[in-house]
Regions:
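A short hydrophobic/aromatic micro-motif that marks alpha-helical segments and, especially, helix-coil
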Residues: 19, 34, 98, 195-197
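Short helix/loop capping segments that flank catalytic or ligand/cofactor-binding pockets
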Residues: 11, 26, 66, 90, ...
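RNase H-like nuclease fold core
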Residues: 1-62, 66-74, 180
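Acidic/histidine-rich catalytic cores and adjacent linkers
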Residues: 54, 58-65, 72, 102-218
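Inter-helix linker motif
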Residues: 72-94
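Conserved phosphate-handling catalytic cores of large alpha/beta enzymes
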Residues: 94-96, 103
């Protein structure tokens, strides 16, 4: 299945789970914010109802992954390649000032296009070579500039995510990205904008009905 969240104004967030095969919404909940406190009891209630996924593709929000691991310890968490690529390239900026940053950005630009085990192995090999060449350089970079901090931050991001990047290559039913659910949220928000001014209670009712009726046509 696929997990994603989207905010509505400042007073609420929609948490959503989608079936990766038929792209229908499995369950959703409107909460104050995307957090362990709100997600954990929701996940537990779904588990009690019989939901036990083998794989969950997620955007990488740490508090949500912690809740998922506690509720479904057997589930593999596939990191969304698009989110990883976008986040890393945003931190590296369009024109990195260091050679290490430029090479890492070039490597990251290939991530979401990996379709085969061979391409995966090439990516991992190239990243291992990059780490070997630049790890000490990054370790001793002055941490007085945001750009230097963000270069190290990107390296840590990839290091932490790497074990969970490529489950989709072993099982074609596992999505590599959360794009399908993000597309659902985009359509929801586009429709919602035609109903601006709803109270929070009516907004939740609107979202509930939208998810219900959209499931009839997806």
């Amino acid at each position: 299945m696929v997990y994603d969240a989207t905010y509505f104004h400042k007073d609420g967030c929609l948490l959503n789970l989608m079936n990766a095969q038929d792209q229908k919404i499995i369950a959703h909940i409107y909460v104050q914010k995307e957090s362990f406190k709100d997600a954990y009891p929701w996940f537990m209630s779904l588990k009690y109802q019989g939901l036990n996924p083998r794989f969950i593709t997620t955007d990488g929000e740490q508090s949500i992954m912690r809740a998922m691991k506690q509720v479904w310890p057997q589930a593999r968490l596939q990191r969304c390649l698009y989110h990883l690529q976008r986040e890393g390239m945003r931190w590296l900026r369009t024109y990195p000032k260091t050679e290490a940053g430029r090479k890492l950005r070039a490597l990251l630009s290939k991530l979401s296009r990996i379709k085969t085990v061979g391409e995966r192995d090439t990516f991992i090999g190239d990243y291992a070579a990059w780490i070997s060449q630049y790890r000490d350089f990054i370790r001793f970079l002055p941490q007085t500039t945001v750009a230097n901090k963000d270069l190290k931050r990107t390296m840590v991001l990839i290091n932490n995510a790497l074990p969970d990047m490529f489950y989709y290559l072993d099982d074609e039913r596992v999505p590599a990205t959360t794009n399908a659910l993000e597309g659902f949220h985009s359509r929801l928000k586009a429709d919602y904008r035609r109903h601006r001014g709803l109270s929070k209670e009516h907004r939740i009712q609107y979202i509930n009905w939208y998810c219900y009726f959209e499931n009839k046509t997806i």
